[in-house]
């Protein structure tokens, strides 16, 4: 319901007037008369844009230069280009790739690359050394495990032997065994 009301109250005209962007007819007539005077010179129009611009009045505004050859876009004839993009790109690249700056950047990049390569080699050597050291430690650890298992097994056997000897002495020599135990407890108490 609200959409119906909004559509009835809204204006269907564009919000921006296109008349603001139209070139007035008196300026078009001025541009056409300048074009005809430049084209009537024959060789003057085809000799180059800078000669035509200087002959047309020295330092003309940029906007008047843009309208000098309006028909070249539509007809496809190349009398004098408005803006030579390839020349502009070439000149900007030439300025940006100044030989001194380029050689300095190239030497800096070479030095940086050499530093990175040397550090990479050092790192690879260190990794190799650490891996060999790790292998040695792993073998030493495995040998230590085997030794610890042997010692644990031997201690278990010795403990069983001592317990069996205690029981044998306690049965065979009870008086001496208890006297020896009392002495041992007295030593611990001191």
From Swiss-Prot:
Compartment annotation: Endosome
GO cellular component, one term: endosome
Bias (Low complexity) ranges: 36-56
Domain of life, per lineage: Eukaryota
Any one GO BP annotation for this protein: regulation of protein localization
InterPro entries listed in its UniProt record: BLOC-1_subunit_KXD1, KxDL_dom
Region annotation (Disordered) ranges: 1-56
Transmembrane segments: none
Keywords, in A-Z order: Endosome, Transport
Stored Pfam families: KxDL
Subunit structure comment from the entry: Component of the biogenesis of lysosome-related organelles complex-1 (BLOC-1).
Family as reported in the entry's similarity comment: Belongs to the KXD1 family.
Function: Component of the biogenesis of lysosome-related organelles complex-1 (BLOC-1) involved in endosomal cargo sorting.
Name under which the protein is recorded: Biogenesis of lysosome-related organelles complex 1 subunit KXD1
Organism, scientific name: Eremothecium gossypii (strain ATCC 10895 / CBS 109.51 / FGSC 9923 / NRRL Y-1056)
Source taxonomy: Eukaryota, Fungi, Dikarya, Ascomycota, Saccharomycotina
């Amino acid at each position: 319901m609200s959409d119906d009301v909004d559509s009835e109250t809204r204006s269907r005209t564009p919000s921006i007037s296109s008349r603001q962007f139209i070139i007035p007819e008196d300026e078009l007539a001025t541009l056409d008369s300048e074009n005809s005077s430049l084209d009537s010179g024959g060789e003057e129009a085809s000799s180059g844009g800078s000669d035509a611009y200087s002959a047309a009045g020295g330092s003309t505004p940029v906007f008047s230069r843009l309208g000098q050859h309006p028909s070249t876009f539509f007809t496809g004839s190349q009398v004098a280009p408005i803006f030579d993009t390839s020349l502009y790109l070439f000149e900007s690249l030439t300025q940006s790739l100044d030989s001194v700056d380029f050689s300095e950047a190239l030497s800096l990049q070479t030095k940086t690359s050499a530093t990175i390569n040397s550090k990479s080699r050092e790192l690879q050597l260190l990794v190799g050394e650490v891996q060999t050291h790790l292998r040695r430690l792993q073998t030493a650890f495995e040998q230590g495990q085997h030794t610890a298992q042997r010692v644990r097994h031997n201690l278990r056997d010795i403990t069983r032997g001592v317990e069996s000897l205690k029981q044998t002495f306690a049965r065979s020599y009870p008086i001496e065994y208890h006297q020896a135990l009392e002495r041992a407890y007295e030593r611990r108490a001191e």
